[in-house]
Structure formats: C-alpha cells, structure tokens
Amino acid sequence: CARRIWRSMAADAYTAKDLRVAPISRADADRVVRLLHYSGKVVPNSQLHLGVFLGDRLEGAMQFGPSMDKRKTLGLVRGTPWNGFLELNRMAFSDRLPRNSESRAMAVAFRMIRRAYPHIEWVVSFSDAAQCGDGAIYRAAGFLLTGIKPNNQILQLPNGSLVARVTVTK
C-alpha cells in the first residue's frame, strides 16, 4: 500500500507538509527544548506545549504562554485585552526536519490556537539574532518585525554556558 511505501522512505524525502503538530506534555516539551534549544532552558510559565512529529518521532516542540514582560508587549497592538495574546516562548526543532518546517509548524499551531482559544488575537515571539538569525523564519510565517536591538540580556559564562542576565546576581 502507498502508506507503507511512504513510511519506508528516507527522512530527506519528507516535506514540511508531512509534519504533524499535536499537544504534548510539559515534560516532553521541556525535554525537547533542553536538548535542542540553543539556550538549553525552558520558560517555566509556558502553558501550551505542541510537539512536531515526523512520522512517529517527536522532532521538535513549541511552547506558548504569557509574555515574559506583558506590560511592555501589550501595547504592540492597540486595544488588546490582557489575555488577548500569547508569546511563543520557545521553539526547538531537530535538524532531521525538512526545509520550511518551522513556518509550516507555526502555521498549523496558529490554526489550532485560533480554534481552541478564539480570544487569542495575536502571538508574539522574539528572535535572538546573535544566536539564531534575524527572525527570517518568523517573517516567513507572517510575523511583523517590530524592532531590532542589541541583546545584552544573555551572558556567556567562562564555562561557555549561556544564562539570562536577570538570573545572575552581583
């Protein structure tokens, strides 16, 4: 049958349309983020955890939740109620996923959010250009670039690990 042949194909034969996005547990999402995200850190107040599957394998995760600094972010879109937006806190994908997986997975996730949480009007995310580019995958998914500024909030410790400035005490 065609399905059996499709499943036996090499991973590079997959396209972004072959991805499946589905809810996963916080524990599974945290594990993927710790393993694959450049910071190795999760956002503790994330509330919605979506897995990105290629075949039966979990190859990525997206974690959504309230914005880390809601007062500053709320003003980006005039008239937004306090609970009217989410932040894509973390997105971590394995290199085994095909081209355009990020924008495809975000599009599917946004449709899921729109259906399940109709009060959510928009999603915000931040891209660290020093670590992972200039936000091109976000713009490909329909995000608007609202600003670029130097990142002075991530510090590299002498042992090479990355930490948020707010977690370091003097």
Predicted regions and their residues:
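Short amphipathic alpha-helix that is part of the acyltransferase structural core
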Residues: 3-44
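A generic structural signal for short, solvent-exposed coil/turn residues
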Residues: 13, 42-44, 56, 80, ...
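A generic secondary-structure signal marking the coil-to-beta-strand transition
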Residues: 17-20, 29, 48, 58-60, ...
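Acyl-donor binding region in acyl/amide transferases
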Residues: 20-23, 47, 65-170
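Conserved beta-hairpin
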Residues: 33, 46-66
